[in-house]
UniProtKB/Swiss-Prot annotation:
Record protein name field: Ribonucleoside-diphosphate reductase small subunit
Active site positions, chain numbering: Y114
InterPro entries referenced in this protein's UniProt entry, alphabetically: Ferritin-like_SF, HSV_RIR2, RNR-like, RNR_small, RNR_small_AS, RNR_small_fam
UniProt family annotation: Belongs to the ribonucleoside diphosphate reductase small chain family.
Listed Pfam families: Ribonuc_red_sm
GO molecular function terms attached to this record: metal ion binding; ribonucleoside-diphosphate reductase activity, thioredoxin disulfide as acceptor
Keywords (A to Z) from UniProt: DNA replication, Host membrane, Iron, Membrane, Metal-binding, Oxidoreductase, Transmembrane, Transmembrane helix, Viral latency, Viral reactivation from latency
Enzymatic reactions: a 2'-deoxyribonucleoside 5'-diphosphate + [thioredoxin]-disulfide + H2O = a ribonucleoside 5'-diphosphate + [thioredoxin]-dithiol
Membrane-spanning parts: 164-184
Job of this protein: Ribonucleoside-diphosphate reductase holoenzyme provides the precursors necessary for viral DNA synthesis. Allows virus growth in non-dividing cells, as well as reactivation from latency in infected hosts. Catalyzes the biosynthesis of deoxyribonucleotides from the corresponding ribonucleotides.
Gene from which the chain derives: RIR2
Organism: Equine herpesvirus 4 (strain 1942) (EHV-4)
């Protein structure tokens, strides 16, 4: 009995001591954190105003569609955080906590960029933008996503199921928006906006990979949902995402290939199922090289970062 009590004391002491310094525990999560650090960028790196000239080149239905997408994307982070809460508080591993700090930091950049693009799409008319956003956040297609998420959070029986929801939000609920924005590039429109879309979609790929890693490797104390439950959630989320696209996509636009985007959404869902050890649900083919948002590995760096100056932007004064 004395030996057993001694072991318990040693374990408690170890936990207490580890709280005071960093100890590597999650190499896969640390790898993703380092990828995020290596690919940091700022909203000030991108001259969004350069794209203002292209707003007039969109047909009215196309302009309305992209205004709608960016209104959703701008609000999405807050909607997710309000419903899923602070999942990072569940973990003691510093690798996971440090990763989430990095993710929160880049999400701030995403929010600022989306706000700038939104304003640009309204010709920098802040009043018109505010009026539009106030009405569109109540749109049926957006409300369906939010209501579905709220209902599923209420139904959640474990933290593991919340991570499935996080994987679906980051990996499915943004997919059609990212692809639709990428199609602008094929017509040489909104070059800077498309560049920001590349960066943000890559960041979200890292975030989704992190959620998959945590689900696979760091939820040992939580009951995981049955495969039938996971498939049901994936099926519902994909259907909602496809309806989201179809509800607002311009009917006669030459900019978009709606069927290709829907196929991409289904492919993304199948890929994520594979990441958590399940067979595909849709058996959707991988997008061809011509698809403007063909699947990118999160390891890929771009010349954008190689061109950035490494000099400090301010003056450092040694006042010691």
């Amino acid at each position: 009995m004395a030996l057993e009590n001694s072991k318990k004391t040693d374990f408690a002491d170890e936990l207490l001591i580890n709280a005071y310094f960093y100890t590597p525990e999650c190499p896969d999560i640390e790898h993703l954190r380092l990828l995020s650090v290596a690919n940091r960028w700022l909203d000030t790196d991108l001259p969004i105003s350069d794209d203002l000239k292209d707003v007039a080149k969109l047909a009215p239905a196309e302009r309305e569609f992209y205004r709608f997408l960016f209104a959703f994307l701008s609000a999405a982070d807050d909607l997710v955080n309000l419903n899923l809460g602070d999942l990072s508080a569940l973990f003691t591993q510093k690798d996971i906590l440090h990763y989430y700090i990095e993710q929160e930091s880049i999400e701030v950049t995403h929010s600022r960029v989306y706000s700038a693009i939104q304003l640009m799409l309204f010709g920098n008319d802040a009043t018109a933008r505010a009026r539009y956003v106030a009405s569109v956040v109540k749109d049926v297609a957006i409300d369906l996503k939010v209501s579905w998420l709220q209902a599923k959070v209420r139904e959640c029986k474990s933290v593991a199921e919340k991570y499935i929801l996080m994987i679906l939000i980051e990996g499915v609920f943004f997919a059609s928006s990212f692809a639709s924005i990428a199609y602008l590039r094929t017509h040489n429109l909104f070059v800077v906006t498309c560049q920001s879309n590349d960066l943000i979609s890559r960041d979200e790929a890292i975030h989704t990979n992190a959620s998959c890693c945590i689900y696979n490797n760091y939820l040992g104390g939580f009951e995981k949902p049955a495969p039938t439950r996971i498939y049901a959630l994936f099926s519902e989320a994909v259907n909602i995402e496809c309806e989201f696209l179809l509800s607002h996509a311009p009917k006669s636009s030459h900019l978009l290939d709606i069927e290709a985007i829907i196929c991409y959404v289904r492919y993304s869902a199948d890929r994520l199922l594979g990441e958590i050890g399940l067979s595909p649900l849709f058996n959707a083919p991988k997008p061809p090289p011509s698809f403007p948002l063909a699947f990118m590995t999160v390891e890929k760096h771009t010349n954008f970062f190689e061109r950035r100056s490494t000099a400090y932007s301010g003056t450092l004064i040694n006042d010691l």
